[in-house]
Amino acid sequence: MTARGAAGRCPSSTWMGSRLLLVCLLVSRSVAEVSEHCSHMIGNGHLQILQQLIDSQMETACLIEYKFVDQEQLDDPVCYLKKAFVLVQVIIEETMRFKDNTPNANATERLQELSMKLNSCFIKDYKEQNEACVQTYKESPLRLLEKIKNFFNETKNFLEKDWNIFSKNCNDSFAKCSSRDVVTKPDCNCLYPKATPSSDLASASPHQPPAPSMAPLADLAWDDSQRTEGSSLLPSDLPLRIEDPGSAKQRPPRSTCQTLESTEQPNHEDPQPHPSAGAPIPGVEDIIESSMGTNWVLEEASGEASEGFLTQERKFSPSNPVGGSIQAETDRPWARSASSPFPKLTEDQQPTNITDTPLTEVNPMRPTGQTLNNTPEKTDGSSTLREDQQEPRSPHFATLNPQRVGNSATPYAKLLPPKSHSWGIVLPLGELEGKKSTRDRRSPAELKGGPASEGAARPVAQSTRDRRSPAELKGGPASEGAARPVARFNSIPLTDTGSSIQDPQTSAFVFWVLGIILVLLAVGGLLFYSWKRRSHRDPRTLDSSVGRPEGSSLAQDEDRQVELPV
């Protein structure tokens, strides 16, 4: 064997030893990289991102549901963080959702990347007891973000001390936990902030101030679905919202959420049978809703509205069998008007035939034997229901009857100042009263009118949208205040079927314009006649000068000039 052949053949043990050495070096290097990577995985920038998320949250009484570790059952801090890591991943991916391409959405994506990188630092040693030591919480988003920030902060501190600390076996600690997850799911998806009653203030988060117990716009959706026949006013035509402090009760906004208890209502009893401010009793709203029809939807579709009933009141006497003084509140838009089938009073008609006969309200939820007495207010002849003098909002309801019409004589200026508007629009009183409707449905018989309607100057396009029968308007003074039949409802939107009465100011303006035009035409005719007469005189003068006699002095002078020698 040559030296070259001996040198080319190396023992197999030599090659194996070198390979093992290379593998050991690679493993040790990877372990060192993992340890260094886990120790500095969470930086101060991630904690700042979480703090910015906390600072950008809106303070709200809305609560969200999520699952997290019950620290009372799991005392070991390492096992607590190890169990919470999986839950934090679920919260970041499913619960923390923001609009795309926003700072909060970008911060959430960075937190998701961080949680994916931390998978190599946490060793999962539990499979069977996945729900152990886990409890369902129902807290505010602010509290949830604070828990997540505390988790990352504590994890950062443990990894800086020992990168392999989360390889600890926590099965024994998880086995000690008892499942006592009895927290129910919230019954709403928190689309808007809910009110926090005084009874729940102790359980609210310390970072949120208690929400007010009245939300003016929270029950808007409920009103749109529950309002009955009344007024289909536009937002610009709605009267100002006025609340009577004696009759208004505080309550949480109407919604499908029933988790919050209603606030306690003070009960004010007044022994005197006058319409004083009393505390509402349960069932008043049911009585009001049951007394109204369901034709409001058709009326809204046809574009009609009963704005003439804005000033009529529904009052309940405190002498009913139920007990206590009843005075319904007017927090809803449909409470500002009565039902549309009742006819309204015009300028030339005043309320008469007012009796003290009680009005029986039948409620399907109550026995029919219970009645509510009406205490109307008699008005004199000077008080009329005009559009520019009536109250745009009354703190009472009006119980209207074809035989009896109640009128409120209290001027608007003496009521309480308006606080809020149901549509969020506050209009001046003058601008509100100046708005008139352009859809006037009156029959030709009404325009001809009787003695009650002659000589009265009616404004153009009254806002009451009268739909009264011709027989009702043909009557004279004897029919004023008498019971009039209910006009048939027309659900089909029509154009103007009757000729509207012109405004006196407009007719006067047209009269003056026509008069000025006639005067100008007369003056122009006179000027044209004088010019024509002068034009006829000028040709006569010219003809007379041409036809002069030959023996005149002028002709002789001309002959003399011609005969002169050159």
From Swiss-Prot:
GN (gene name): Csf1
Membrane side Extracellular: residue ranges: 33-508
Stated name of the protein: Macrophage colony-stimulating factor 1
Pfam short name (any one): CSF-1
Signal peptide residues on this chain, from the entry's feature table: 1-32
Functional summary from the UniProt entry: Cytokine that plays an essential role in the regulation of survival, proliferation and differentiation of hematopoietic precursor cells, especially mononuclear phagocytes, such as macrophages and monocytes. Promotes the release of pro-inflammatory chemokines, and thereby plays an important role in innate immunity and in inflammatory processes. Plays an important role in the regulation of osteoclast proliferation and differentiation, the regulation of bone resorption, and is required for normal bone development. Required for normal male and female fertility.
Cytoplasmic domain ranges by topology: 532-566
Transmembrane portions of the chain: 509-531
Record field: compositional bias (Polar residues): 253-265, 348-360, 400-410
Membrane protein topology class: Single-pass type I membrane protein
MF terms in GO: cytokine activity; growth factor activity; identical protein binding; macrophage colony-stimulating factor receptor binding; protein homodimerization activity
GO cellular component terms given for this protein: CSF1-CSF1R complex; extracellular region; extracellular space; perinuclear region of cytoplasm; plasma membrane
Transmembrane keyword on record: yes
